[in-house]
Amino acid sequence: MSSPRSNKPKIVNGPGGYILQDVPHLIDYLPDLPTYPNPLQDNPAYSVVKQYFVHADDSVPEKVVVHKDGPRGVHFRRAGPRQKVYFESDEVHACIVTCGGLCPGLNTVIREVVSSLSYMYGVKRILGIDGGYRGFYAKNTIPLNSKVVNDIHKRGGTIIGTSRGGHDTNKIVDSIQDRGINQVYIIGGDGTQRGASVIFEEIRRRRLKVAVVGIPKTIDNDIPVIDKSFGFDTAVEEAQRAINAAHVEAESNENGIGFVKLMGRYSGYIAMYATLASRDVDCCLIPESPFYLEGEGGLFEFIERRLKDHGHMVIVLAEGAGQDLMCKSMESTPMDASGNKLLKDVGLWLSQSIKDHFKKNKMVMNLKYIDPTYMIRAVPSNASDNVYCTLLAQSAVHGAMAGYTGYTSGLVNGRQTYIPFYRITETQNNVVITDRMWARLLSSTNQPSFLGPKDTSEEKKELPETPLLDDGAVDIPPVTKEVTK
């Protein structure tokens, strides 16, 4: 028996600086697999669609704005149905697992994976893995069909349960092999996708005909490459309720301060977009933008000035902001089961610090602290996220049926793509505070940047020079393997 091909990333180079960061395929290590006509050819719902099947050479650029003399840059394989599939309908035994924290849209993704497998490809055997990764070997499975998932998109949470941690690669793959599962749909954040990548590598090592597909989920919107993560729009919309309440409280009291803490462990996207959407916020604090409390240009001085000028203000704080002010080192901070640092409650600490400052200076102030952290992630997804979840799920199913594996289904520049796991797990998506979007926020709130010239210059130095233009930093990983096409 021949050994599997190299596990290095699949890179295809083309003219004009074209780079395709391709995803693995079952035939990479099982070259003799038969193909079958796609059942969608006989599906009346798609008979009127012209060019419904995606061309094998279609790809989507990672960056759409380029210099006229610059390279074409990195591309990803376009998602969608192929004319040939590598699984027969009766052969498919699929499973779905959700891991990590809750996020609006989880049930919608589950529903659409089941519906796509059932209605598009005639698949009958679909299982839900109960309670995250450990459910593969520690719990019973949940049979899923179109009747079971019919209206679950109207509910928050996940009907198959979730958990953090519990990743035991050998036990998980043993369970997949023993149950005869050949399509695995894994819904979760960056840690979950890293686990999915390890599962895929073990499945490839065992040379199993099993497609492993990731669907990226994080309410913080901190997964790289993709335009946004599902549930983010809903979270921003739901955060408006808390901000509106804070604004009402602040306006109704002398020197009133409405203080809202939102999710955002390392990335401040929810706080930033909720602030921009609200237009009632006077100060937004995020992990990426350091700030200080005392002295000229500090937060306390800004609060005093804003209260003097307007008589009230609203502060929005991401949960990961200001952690350095609470403790000198994060090294001793405990971890949760997924390996994430358990952050201290900076919201309570900062609100108390503001109260103490005003009391010390004998100034009247009324602060109302609102923490909707878990409320914004436990709600059903809104209309926009429901549509997005549908597209993600359908694209994931099309890719698995076409034999692709070891990839994440994601939206890049408005197009559905297949992204190799290593691009999703290699870094984290953060707000770039020298970017136009952060400048728009500062213009909206009229808050200081809390950065000196030195901080700004250092931030800009961190951004790599590249002929590709974008609002944020661009990072094209080096080509590690060349495949001539």
UniProtKB/Swiss-Prot annotation:
**Which amino acids does the record list as binding ATP?**
G101, R164, G165, G189, D190, G191, T192
Q: Where does Mg(2+) bind?
A: D190
Question: Could you tell me in which tissues this protein is expressed?
Answer: Expressed in roots, leaves, stems and flowers.
- Could you mention a single GO BP entry for this protein? glycolytic process
Q: Coding gene?
A: PFK7
Q: What lineage is this protein's organism placed in?
A: Eukaryota, Viridiplantae, Streptophyta, Embryophyta, Tracheophyta
Protein name in UniProt: ATP-dependent 6-phosphofructokinase 7
Q: What is its main location?
A: cytoplasm
Q: Can you tell me which residues form the catalytic site?
A: D220
Q: Mind listing the GO molecular function terms for this protein?
A: 6-phosphofructokinase activity; ATP binding; metal ion binding
Residue numbers for the site described as Important for substrate specificity? G191
Q: Which family does it belong to?
A: Belongs to the phosphofructokinase type A (PFKA) family. PPi-dependent PFK group II subfamily. Atypical ATP-dependent clade 'X' sub-subfamily.
Q: Where does the record place it?
A: Cytoplasm
Q: Which InterPro entries match?
A: ATP_PFK, PFKA, Phosphofructokinase_dom, PKF_sf, PyroP-dep_PFK_TP0108
Q: Which reaction does it catalyse?
A: beta-D-fructose 6-phosphate + ATP = beta-D-fructose 1,6-bisphosphate + ADP + H(+)
- What is the documented function of this protein? Catalyzes the phosphorylation of D-fructose 6-phosphate to fructose 1,6-bisphosphate by ATP, the first committing step of glycolysis.
